[in-house]
Amino acid sequence: MAAVSLSVSTVKPLGDRVFVKVSESEEKTAGGILLPDTAKEKPQVGEVVQVGPGKRNDDGSRQAPEVGVGDKVLYSKYAGTDIKLSTDEYVLLSEKDILAVVN
């Protein structure tokens, strides 16, 4: 089997899925204490980098996604599939797992 090179531009979400770049988690507490990786909260905010074509309706038409590339979103804590590309972290979510668009 040939190796596949993954990058953000080669990932195309299907259906109502959304590809989100995860925001950096806090490195220190408010008191200045450095946190080890095991103590950091899992981030729930990120920027949409790819969007699928939308959910297919019963009649075969597509329902357009409510979010677009560049939107900053808040999503469910344990939703989606975590993906690491080079040094950046991403999550592939179903649109229903997105709770809000953050301005």
From Swiss-Prot:
Gene3D superfamilies: GroES chaperonin. It comes from the Bacteria. Keywords: Chaperone, Cytoplasm. One of its GO terms (biological process) is chaperone cofactor-dependent protein refolding. GO terms for molecular function: ATP binding; metal ion binding; protein folding chaperone; protein-folding chaperone binding; unfolded protein binding. The keyword Plastid does not apply. Belongs to the GroES chaperonin family. Heptamer of 7 subunits arranged in a ring. Interacts with the chaperonin GroEL. PANTHER family: 10 KDA HEAT SHOCK PROTEIN, CO-CHAPERONIN GROES. Together with the chaperonin GroEL, plays an essential role in assisting protein folding. The GroEL-GroES system forms a nano-cage that allows encapsulation of the non-native substrate proteins and provides a physical environment optimized to promote and accelerate protein folding. GroES binds to the apical surface of the GroEL ring, thereby capping the opening of the GroEL channel. This is Co-chaperonin GroES. It comes from Prochlorococcus marinus (strain MIT 9313). The lineage of its organism: Bacteria, Bacillati, Cyanobacteriota, Cyanophyceae, Synechococcales. The gene is groES.
